[in-house]
Design a protein with these regions (language model features):
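Phosphate/dinucleotide-binding and metal-coordinating scaffold of catalytic cores
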Residues: 1-169
Length: 169
């Protein structure tokens, strides 16, 4: 009986409140959804892929951008229907992936954006990265950028060790 009363009540109720996203700070999108979109490195790759297909990134609406993310984003949200950009390709050797990222970022190559984008999890941030899965779990692997020193990974590892040491009780 309660379910019928609620249904009857909701059928007669109209909601007049509307929320319209403003142009700032999220380009006509709401923060909860904007957080799903790539920025930095991921946006750079996406723009290059779209350009190859003759699409200007600036002409896309927030809904079109979210449909490109589909179910491949890092968060819990999934956007359907999905719009597929590029081709699904398997993850190459991590050293090869690092070199591909450096070549694309330095604009020496324009052939590997789809491999990098597909395996990036639509990443944010400025550094190249990929999602890697093995028997021990899932990993976010960060690579160095063209302006990073060659031992950047070792430096980040050492900072992590210091952080762990300082966090001990």
């Amino acid at each position: 009986m309660v379910g019928k009363q609620l249904l009857h009540l909701s059928a007669r109720t109209t909601f007049k409140a509307r929320f319209i996203a403003q142009p700032e700070p999220f380009w006509g999108n709401f923060g909860i959804f904007e957080d799903s979109l790539p920025n930095g490195y991921g946006l750079y790759l996406l723009n290059r892929l779209l350009k190859k297909q003759g699409v200007n990134d600036m002409d896309l609406t927030p809904i079109q951008r979210l449909s490109i993310i589909g179910c491949s984003g890092m968060g819990a949200l999934c956007y359907i229907p999905e719009t597929y950009i590029g081709e699904e390709k398997s993850l190459p050797d991590l050293d090869d992936l690092q070199q591909m990222a450096l070549d694309v970022l330095s604009e020496k190559s324009n052939k590997d954006e789809d491999i990098l984008y597909f395996n990036s999890g639509n990443s944010g941030g400025c550094r190249p990265k990929c999602l890697f899965h093995d028997t021990e779990g899932s990993w976010l692997v960060k690579f160095r950028h063209t302006y990073d020193p060659k031992d950047m990974g070792l430096m980040e590892y050492r900072y992590n060790e210091i952080n762990l040491f300082c966090s001990q009780d």
